[in-house]
From Swiss-Prot:
<dbReference type="InterPro" id="IPR002314">
    <property type="entry name" value="aa-tRNA-synt_IIb"/>
</dbReference>
<feature type="binding site">
    <location>
        <begin position="354"/>
        <end position="357"/>
    </location>
    <ligand>
        <name>ATP</name>
    </ligand>
</feature>
<dbReference type="GO" id="GO:0004828">
    <property type="term" value="F:serine-tRNA ligase activity"/>
</dbReference>
<dbReference type="InterPro" id="IPR006195">
    <property type="entry name" value="aa-tRNA-synth_II"/>
</dbReference>
<keyword id="KW-0436">Ligase</keyword>
<feature type="binding site">
    <location>
        <position position="388"/>
    </location>
    <ligand>
        <name>L-serine</name>
    </ligand>
</feature>
<keyword id="KW-0547">Nucleotide-binding</keyword>
<dbReference type="InterPro" id="IPR010978">
    <property type="entry name" value="tRNA-bd_arm"/>
</dbReference>
<dbReference type="GO" id="GO:0005524">
    <property type="term" value="F:ATP binding"/>
</dbReference>
<keyword id="KW-0648">Protein biosynthesis</keyword>
<dbReference type="Pfam" id="PF00587">
    <property type="entry name" value="tRNA-synt_2b"/>
</dbReference>
<dbReference type="GO" id="GO:0005737">
    <property type="term" value="C:cytoplasm"/>
</dbReference>
<protein>
    <recommendedName>
        <fullName>Serine--tRNA ligase</fullName>
        <ecNumber>6.1.1.11</ecNumber>
    </recommendedName>
</protein>
<comment type="subunit">
    <text>Homodimer. The tRNA molecule binds across the dimer.</text>
</comment>
<dbReference type="InterPro" id="IPR033729">
    <property type="entry name" value="SerRS_core"/>
</dbReference>
<dbReference type="InterPro" id="IPR015866">
    <property type="entry name" value="Ser-tRNA-synth_1_N"/>
</dbReference>
<dbReference type="InterPro" id="IPR002317">
    <property type="entry name" value="Ser-tRNA-ligase_type_1"/>
</dbReference>
Amino acid sequence: MIDPKLLRQDLTELKQKLAKRGYELDVDFWQQMESQRKSLQVITEDLQAKRNAGAKQVGVLKKNGEDATELLAEMQNISSEMKQAEESLKALQDKINQAALQIPNIPADDVPEGSSEEDNVEVRKWGTPRQFDFKVQEHSDLGEVLGQLDFAAAAKLTGSRFSVLKGQLAQLHRALIQFMLNTHTVKYGYTECYVPYIVNSDSLEGTGQLPKFEEDLFKLTNHTNNEAMGFYLIPTAEVPMTNLVRGERLDASELPLKFTAHTPCFRSEAGSHGRDTRGLIRQHQFEKVEMVNIATAAQSDELLEQMTGQAEYILQQLQLPYRVVKLCTGDMGFSALRTYDIEVWVPSQDTYREISSCSNCGDFQARRMGTRVKEGKKTELVHTLNGSGLAVGRTLLAIMENHQNADGSITIPEVLRPYMGGAEIISA
């Protein structure tokens, strides 16, 4: 949530900043809300003052042995009016808060302006895409010929946008998870977490998925009456890990907190009809190793650079060419103020595809969660950061395609061989 003070001050400037990311701020609505809030606040404070003054008068009358019946009746009316005014003020404040939850984060000043991924800015590249001397196969074909990637079985079990891995590909998938977690914990000092895959609505509101993006989530219902239970499958481990500090007051000496976890992620892909329908690019269920940092305001910018570099290191060790792009204002996620995407080279598509997104959310999520840090006498909101380190399925497909051989076998990257009993090749 953005700072509520901004909605009471220069709305024109705020409108301009939010317009950069394609959000139209309703200035008239917010001016009306603030006018009503001030009016109800004045009424409530006036009634409070009258009640306090009346209470003193009653005390004086009783002390002097005088009749206070009439004044007590008047005070009862004031109390009734005050209760109504307070209820009206609370209802209005709830309406204001709900409306504020729909407003995205304000982009940082250095974020390039733009409306789509076409306006993202390339920051750097690593590695050179391999020149093949045979016809490149896409990962779905490679996996099916190997007999180790089965979309038909997944469709029978569940439906479209699911997959079944078998044999060495399933082992490679597991090896990637172990390698990623070991890298983040041993090399970079993250604390590994095991978290619930089901969260409540407060958690999703804290990180910004609710209330605006409910259609992207899988919501649990009671099978006996089909009523919502208030629980959702996680779309990313960012949600439970960031919410570990919801409502907490931390000490500056504790920060940064660095969490990592491997979880399945569940997404409805509501807006992706017809896109990437084949293969592992876009699934309803996929695995991801996530990184979350909880930091002070002074730490967060540098931590974003570090986190992005940590995700890059994984790709470098796997010998996968990639590029880093800074997302433009119109392509950033709802909660982010600055985001780097890492895109891995996919030979069959002759292009780079997103494999990691690393974001600094500033105090946007912290304000929603009520998470603060105390440094000396000063208490302020923490900053939160999150990043994929990495999306496992997309890393798997990148290995399959970039390290494929003419006979349809796949060369296992050296760093993964210890996790696969020393095997060097995946073959039928």
